[in-house]
Amino acid sequence: MERSAPVQASLWSARMVEWSLMAGVILVLALVFARKLQVVQGQGELAAVQSTLGALRTALVLEHLQKSTVGQGSSVAGTQRNPFELLDRMPANYRGEITRASASSAPPGSWLFDKDCVCVGYVPLYPKWFDSPSGNTVAWYRVSGAPGPLQLLAEEAYVWQDQALN
């Protein structure tokens, strides 16, 4: 009987080492998964931003083409208005007309329009992926263009996860 006690103690300590290693491996895998999930969320937001910018640009071109077929093509450059009004459906995260000064109070993930500068702005949902040369926390796109269709031009060289956001 004296020998069974040390064998049980060594089995118990070996079992604890196994479970500790298993818990460590699971913890490392969970941390790697959480990191990859954040990257994918950032990529999803980038895709949504690019899609909305594409829809706005397309709406501006279609408006120009429509006005040129009616014969109002020369006055298109003077009608710089909110491009969100040209969309069939407003984005769910569009917050309306907000000035640059109060843009920081908009909730993350919001689109906005500043009628004073005729600019479209986006407040990132995950700002850790967004980089602005000036350190601005909002991506601004100026509505401009003459002659021809109005365009959305990035005010800075924005970068999102090492990709140009223009």
Feature map (PLM): residue ranges:
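Short, surface-exposed interaction loops/tails
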Residues: 119-166
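Intrinsically disordered, low-complexity regions enriched in Ser/Pro/Gly/Gln/His and often acidic
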Residues: 12, 103-106, 153
